[in-house]
């Protein structure tokens, strides 16, 4: 028991001694750091370029880390990004011998105390010209200064929406010195591309790279070169949102348009369906126009909307024409022979359009009806002949009756005269029946003419329905193929 207490006592003493030594070291470090700071900045000025020889070029190493894409405003063509900007350079006046300061090799001081390169974003699209964030810099014993500063940048980005919503964008971030030329400050990119290791995944865009390229430009105003480093941010749009909210509804609505040809002409809704679909697509077109920049490049989905709206307009116009054909009455001319052969004989069989009571197993029904009608006409012709013969018989009968009337002047002659009057009544009845038969015959002919025109309209409906279905299908495949 005493042995355990003794060991615990020694452990406590060791921990106390270690903590005391660390505190002494820290206080010594702090003492040397304060001494070093006072000696370094006693005669230091951050207004001048920190080189011993003014003809010497000061190299500034630049590294960009992309943390997050905050916004991509396609309409105003502005990219808002959250960056970590690391700059490092050597200050010839901020060096020390670390052995004289108890091995102190680096200190952290506010960045506004040292000279800083005036590197700015050339293609900045922000109205706020605020100064850089005043974060600390790391100052090493050999004079190397490392300055890490966060920045929310708004840069101009030329947006090409030709393949929206399956588009890819390339946005440039160009950094360079605002006042120093290449003979005074040279910019060197530390990596061949921007650092994407800490990138927070965006819900709308995929990052496919951020290559960096150094450019040396000579402007017309000056003969000195001006270097800059351009980081090209390659973005690929995630199109699922736009597919389910803009493209897929448009495709479904487009397939509704050809069904207007399948509606019965007497329903009165054929034109209404086309106009309703056209208005729905107009709403989607306006939604796309609100988010796209007003440029001459029409997006792919916009072209699809325009093509679909043109197709629906054509289908509505054809529907109106076909409805006029459908409602041709007795005043219309008969169906032309070419239309009878092409539309009624061939196309009606291809598109399975038959009369009431007719199906695909009885294609000769019309011919049989024609044969029956011709037979009926022959019978009616026979009736006409019998009527003519009966009329001749009546005249013969009248002559005989007149002869008998002259021969006999008795009661028998009066009976014969009554028979003649009855024959006259029969003749009037026959004339009335013939008139009624002619009216019925004309009515049937006009009705058959209207039925033929209705069948022509129905065949045209089926024909254009399949034509427009094929057009919608190929348009949908075309837009998906272009996206791929």
Curated annotation (Swiss-Prot):
One of its GO terms (biological process) is monoatomic ion transmembrane transport. Component of neuronal acetylcholine receptors (nAChRs) that function as pentameric, ligand-gated cation channels with high calcium permeability among other activities. nAChRs are excitatory neurotrasnmitter receptors formed by a collection of nAChR subunits known to mediate synaptic transmission in the nervous system and the neuromuscular junction. Each nAchR subunit confers differential attributes to channel properties, including activation, deactivation and desensitization kinetics, pH sensitivity, cation permeability, and binding to allosteric modulators. The gene is CHRNA9. It is found in: Synaptic cell membrane; Cell membrane. Glycans are attached at residues 59, 172. One of its GO terms (molecular function) is transmitter-gated monoatomic ion channel activity involved in regulation of postsynaptic membrane potential. Na(+) binds at residues 193, 195. Pfam families: Neur_chan_LBD, Neur_chan_memb. Disulfide bonds join 157-171, 221-222. Residues 326-462 are cytoplasmic. Residues 1-27 form the signal peptide. Residues 364-395 are annotated as: Disordered. Activated by a myriad of ligands such as acetylcholine. AChR activity is inhibited by the antagonist alpha-conotoxins RgIA and GeXXA, small disulfide-constrained peptides from cone snails. This is Neuronal acetylcholine receptor subunit alpha-9. Its main location: membrane. The lineage of its organism: Eukaryota, Metazoa, Chordata, Craniata, Vertebrata. Forms homo- or heteropentameric channels in conjunction with CHRNA10. The native outer hair cell receptor is composed of CHRNA9:CHRNA10 heterooligomers. Found in the stoichiometric form (CHRNA9)2:(CHRNA10)3. The record marks 148 as: Key residue important for potent inhibition of the CHRNA9:CHRNA10 receptor by the alpha-conotoxin RgIA (AC P0C1D0). It catalyses: Ca(2+)(in) = Ca(2+)(out); K(+)(in) = K(+)(out); Na(+)(in) = Na(+)(out); Mg(2+)(in) = Mg(2+)(out). PROSITE patterns: NEUROTR_ION_CHANNEL. Residues 28-240 are extracellular. InterPro entries: Neur_chan_lig-bd, Neur_chan_lig-bd_sf, Neur_channel, Neuro-gated_channel_TM_sf, Neuro_actylchol_rec, Neurotrans-gated_channel_TM, Neurotransmitter_ion_chnl_CS, Nicotinic_acetylcholine_rcpt. CDD domains: LGIC_ECD_nAChR_A9, LGIC_TM_cation. Expressed in hair cells of the cochlea (at protein level). Expressed in hair cells of the cochlea. The chain crosses the membrane at residues 241-261, 271-291, 305-325, 463-483. One of its GO terms (cellular component) is postsynaptic membrane. Keywords: Calcium, Calcium channel, Calcium transport, Cell membrane, Disulfide bond, Glycoprotein, Ion channel, Ion transport, Ligand-gated ion channel, Membrane, Metal-binding, Receptor, Signal, Sodium, Synapse, Transmembrane, Transmembrane helix, Transport.
């Amino acid at each position: 028991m005493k042995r355990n207490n003794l060991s615990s006592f020694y452990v406590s003493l060791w921990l106390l001694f270690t903590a005391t030594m660390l505190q002494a070291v820290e206080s010594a470090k702090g003492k040397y750091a304060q001494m070093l700071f006072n000696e370094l900045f006693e005669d230091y000025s951050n207004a001048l370029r920190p080189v011993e020889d003014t003809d010497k070029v000061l190299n500034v190493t630049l590294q960009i880390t992309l943390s997050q894409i905050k916004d991509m405003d396609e309409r105003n063509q502005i990219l808002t990004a959250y960056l970590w900007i690391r700059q490092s350079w050597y200050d010839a006046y901020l060096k020390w011998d670390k052995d004289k300061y108890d091995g102190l090799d680096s200190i952290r001081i506010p960045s506004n105390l040292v000279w800083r390169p005036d590197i700015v974003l050339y293609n900045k699209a922000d109205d706020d010209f605020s100064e850089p964030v005043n974060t600390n810099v790391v100052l090493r014993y050999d004079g190397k200064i490392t300055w890490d500063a966060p920045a929310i940048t708004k840069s101009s980005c030329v947006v090409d929406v030709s393949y929206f919503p399956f588009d890819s964008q390339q946005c440039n971030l160009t950094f360079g010195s605002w006042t120093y030329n290449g003979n005074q400050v040279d910019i060197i990119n530390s990596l061949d591309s921007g650092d994407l290791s800490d990138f927070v995944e965006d819900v709308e865009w995929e990052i496919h790279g951020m290559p960096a390229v150094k450019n040396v430009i000579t402007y017309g105003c000056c003969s000195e070169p001006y270097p800059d480093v351009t980081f090209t941010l390659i973005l690929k749009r995630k199109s699922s949102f736009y597919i389910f909210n803009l493209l897929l509804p448009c495709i479904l609505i487009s397939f509704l348009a050809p069904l207007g040809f399948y509606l019965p002409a007497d329903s009165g809704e054929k034109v209404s369906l086309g106009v309703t679909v056209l208005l729905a697509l107009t709403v989607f077109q306006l939604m796309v126009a609100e988010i796209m920049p007003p440029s001459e490049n029409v997006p792919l989905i916009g072209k699809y909307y325009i093509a679909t709206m043109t197709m629906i307009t054509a289908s509505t116009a054809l529907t109106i024409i076909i409805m006029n054909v459908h409602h041709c009455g007795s005043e219309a001319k008969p169906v032309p022979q070419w239309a009878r052969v092409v539309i009624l004989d061939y196309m009606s069989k291809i598109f399975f359009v038959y009369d009431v009571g007719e199906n695909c197993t009885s294609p000769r029904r019309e011919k049989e009806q024609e044969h029956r009608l011709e037979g009926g006409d022959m019978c009616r012709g026979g009736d006409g002949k019998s009527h003519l013969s009966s009329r001749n018989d009546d005249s013969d009968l009248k002559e005989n009756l007149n002869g008998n009337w002259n021969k006999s002047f008795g009661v028998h002659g009066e009976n014969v005269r009554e028979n003649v009057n009855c024959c006259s009544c029969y003749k009037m009845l026959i004339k009335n029946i013939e008139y009624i038969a002619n009216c019925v015959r004309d009515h049937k002919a006009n009705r058959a003419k209207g039925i033929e025109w209705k069948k022509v309209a129905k065949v045209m409906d089926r024909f254009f329905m399949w034509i427009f279905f094929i057009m919608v299908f190929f348009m949908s495949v075309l837009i998906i193929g272009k996206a791929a």
